[in-house]
Regions:
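C-terminal accessory extensions appended to soluble enzyme cores
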Residues: 118-141
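Conserved catalytic-core segment of NTP-binding enzymes
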Residues: 4-119, 132
């Protein structure tokens, strides 16, 4: 789940359905972008996660470090996000299951030798969202 407690409330409606699943079969991911003000520190991230858990009535089972600034992202974003998510993971006991990023940035970040325990599975992604019309008309999708 991502977003905030208000957005997580919609998941709470499905609690009975989730409770009917075999124990351990539901994975609830907290997709984290530490460049967003509400998740920029370990304290803020844990507070946000606890609010989402309360409103969704589900426990987060893993973090996804998705720290980015869209097309302006660089390896520093992944590195900074790693530090925040690592500390939040250590404090909360919630494991880091994935780290996402553009392939070039992810490769650079992984080459730095960070603790794999707080990276999880690397997941290369492409950015398709355009922040402005000019970029879209110049570059297309």
């Amino acid at each position: 789940m991502g977003g905030d407690p208000a957005g997580a409330t919609a998941l709470g409606r499905y609690r009975e359905d989730f409770d009917a699943l075999p124990e351990g079969s539901l994975t609830v991911l907290n997709v984290v972008n530490t460049r967003r003000p509400m998740a920029g520190t370990p304290e803020k991230l844990i507070h946000l996660m606890e609010g989402m858990e309360r409103h969704s009535r589900q426990k987060v089972t893993g973090f996804v470090n998705n720290t980015n600034l869209a097309r302006m992202a660089n390896a520093d974003d992944l590195r900074d996000g790693y530090e925040v998510v690592r500390e939040a993971s250590e404090r909360s006991g919630v494991p880091v299951l994935y780290t996402t990023g553009r392939p070039d940035l992810l490769e650079q970040f992984l080459a730095e030798g960070h603790d794999p325990k707080f990276i999880g599975a690397p997941m290369p992604i492409q950015t398709y969202m355009h922040r402005d019309w000019e970029t879209f008309t110049r570059e297309g999708l």
